[in-house]
A protein has these predicted regions:
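Bacterial Sec-dependent N-terminal signal peptides
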Residues: 1-23
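Structural signature of multi-pass, alpha-helical inner-membrane proteins
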Residues: 19-186
């Protein structure tokens, strides 16, 4: 009887996480790429946007769905001399174990570590985990981990001049999944 009750509770609790109200699963996960992918713009000397597909990802997620607690937005306006800079930051709230794993990657100063963010196994966007002390530039999505937060920038500020270009971070599939699992905080 005890085994049956334990098994029933185990089924209830393991199925409760990552599901929407109608029972469909909705998983957001982050994978490190198996190998380095080249920039889409091969003339670009800095790291920049790249393409990856499902076969470029390992079997196990680097950051699992249950480690993603929430997703928030932050907008800062910085005035410097005659210029105005707008920082539209998006942030994952994660477990400290997730940020510890990122910070233990020993990310090189020059080039970051490529990752892919997925929803239900489909790649939503790709980017780089970046070293906090790096002064190198990056023309692609860049992520920094600290405390229990991963800041996701469209590009590093020194390279984010194209106001009119598409922001891959603003993805309705990602936001719908986070909203359905009560993790989207605007």
């Amino acid at each position: 009887m005890t085994r049956l009750l334990t098994f029933a509770l185990l089924l209830i609790f393991t199925n409760a996480f990552g599901q929407t109200k109608n029972g469909q699963t909705c998983k957001v996960e982050v994978y490190l790429l198996k190998s380095v992918k080249p920039n889409l713009d091969t003339a670009l000397k800095l790291r920049g946007p790249f393409l990856a597909n499902i076969t470029d990802l390992p079997d196990t997620a680097f950051i699992k769905d249950h480690e993603i607690i929430g997703y928030t937005f932050k907008r800062d306006t910085i005035k410097f001399k005659d210029s105005i800079f707008i920082d539209n930051r998006q942030m994952f709230e994660v477990t400290s174990a997730a940020t510890d794993r990122i910070n233990n990657l020993k990310i090189p100063l020059c080039c970051g570590r490529q990752f892919a963010l997925t929803v239900n196994g489909n790649i939503i966007y790709t980017g780089y985990f970046w070293n906090l002390v790096s002064s190198w530039g990056c023309d692609g999505i860049t992520a920094f981990a600290h405390d229990t937060r991963i800041d996701i920038l469209r590009k590093l500020p020194d390279y984010d001049f194209a106001i009119d270009s598409e922001d891959q971070r603003r993805n309705s599939i990602l936001f719908d999944c986070l909203s359905k699992t009560n993790r989207l905080h605007k």
